[in-house]
Regions:
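Terminal targeting segments of Actinobacterial cell-envelope proteins
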Residues: 1-8
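Entry/capping segment at the start of metal-dependent catalytic domains
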Residues: 8-98
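Extracytoplasmic
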Residues: 62-65, 84-89, 98-106, 117, ...
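Flexible, polar/acidic helix-loop-strand segments at domain edges
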Residues: 63, 162-243
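Structured segments of extracytoplasmic/periplasmic soluble domains
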Residues: 70, 76, 109, 137-147, ...
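Short, solvent-exposed loop/turn elements at domain surfaces
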Residues: 75-81, 100-103, 112-115, 234
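Second-shell loop/turn segments in exported
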Residues: 76-81, 120-128, 143-148, 211-212, ...
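Flexible, solvent-exposed short loops/turns enriched in glycine
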Residues: 102-129
Length: 243
């Protein structure tokens, strides 16, 4: 009877060691990510204290948290914030129970009432009045009641992706070509490095077909989100941004 007990104690001891190592590893990873995230310049703004326009007549949804996500055409640290267009506009809805996330893009060239009955491209609302005006535009035109937002520029997006260890993204031949081209500019503007992806040889007959899945770093992922010259044009661009 003693042998089974010794074996059980040994297995329990091994499990305790494994759990301890996983815990230590988790703390290490958390520390590494936290240290990198601390390098991101985060500016918090309470929109509730500003003149954000809400739509009181819009249907009130319960059990969901909704955010407006803005990708800013802000490239240099010397440029003043809130004066640039938001070339990426995404509405993110999170199910509070299941944590499932649904993303809907608003095309940047959509003609909307951006401020005081002034109609222009949706991406210009941010330049007209910062996040307050951009969120108000969404509420006014789309019957929403959003009060929270996240805005991110090139530098922050590159840093966040690198903190996550990169992203695995399926790419077509055409996407590789355009992404490599964009990487040159993105790298220069952010000061971050990258390695160009080698083009498949031979060149596929269908340049729009997926050729493989590639691991992208921050510069590459940001450049991937900027692609708009494939056959699907801006529809394809917004789809890439939601991945």
């Amino acid at each position: 009877m003693s042998k089974p007990r010794k074996k059980s104690k040994k297995i329990l001891f091994i499990l305790e060691i494994v759990v301890l190592l996983l815990f230590i590893g988790g703390l290490f990873v958390y520390g590494q990510i936290s240290a990198k995230l601390d390098k991101i310049d985060i500016q918090e703004t309470d929109l509730a204290d500003q003149d954000i326009v809400t739509n009181d007549q819009a249907p009130q949804m319960t059990g969901y948290t909704t955010y407006a996500l803005f990708g800013l055409d802000h490239r240099s640290k010397n440029e003043k914030l809130n004066t640039e267009n938001s070339d990426t506009i995404i509405i993110a809805s999170i199910n509070n129970d299941t944590k499932a996330v649904k993303l809907v893009s608003v095309y940047r060239d959509t003609l909307l009432n951006v401020k005081d009955d002034t109609y222009s491209k949706a991406n210009s609302a941010y330049a007209f009045g910062g996040p307050t005006n951009a969120v108000s535009m969404l509420n006014t035109n789309l019957d929403l009641n959003i009060t929270d937002y996240v805005a991110i520029d090139f530098n922050a997006l590159v840093t966040v992706v690198d903190c996550l260890g990169g992203l695995d993204i399926p790419l077509s031949y055409a996407e590789i070509v355009h992404m490599n081209n964009y990487c040159v500019e993105t790298s220069e503007e952010t000061g971050k490095s990258y390695t160009p992806i080698e083009l498949p040889d031979p060149k596929p007959e269908d340049e729009e077909a997926i050729v493989d899945t590639y691991h992208l770093n921050g510069v590459q992922a940001t450049s991937y989100c900027r692609i708009r010259y494939t056959a699907s044009l801006d529809m394809g661009r917004t789809e890439r941004q939601r991945r």
